[in-house]
Amino acid sequence: GSCLELGKYCDGSKDDCQCCRDNAYCGCDIFGYNWE
């Protein structure tokens, strides 16, 4: 899957949110992150 750019917000895409979780740099509601 693709990874979101730094500071971008995840819209719920599984791949993007997994990347967000793994790298901990972008917002993703389903993992409890809400970073701007």
From Swiss-Prot:
<comment type="function">
    <text>Not toxic to mice by intracerebroventricular injection.</text>
</comment>
<keyword id="KW-0964">Secreted</keyword>
<dbReference type="GO" id="GO:0005576">
    <property type="term" value="C:extracellular region"/>
</dbReference>
<dbReference type="InterPro" id="IPR013605">
    <property type="entry name" value="Toxin_34"/>
</dbReference>
<dbReference type="Pfam" id="PF08396">
    <property type="entry name" value="Toxin_34"/>
</dbReference>
<dbReference type="GO" id="GO:0090729">
    <property type="term" value="F:toxin activity"/>
</dbReference>
<comment type="similarity">
    <text>Belongs to the neurotoxin 04 (omega-agtx) family. 03 (type II/III omega-agtx) subfamily.</text>
</comment>
<protein>
    <recommendedName>
        <fullName>U14-ctenitoxin-Co1b</fullName>
    </recommendedName>
</protein>
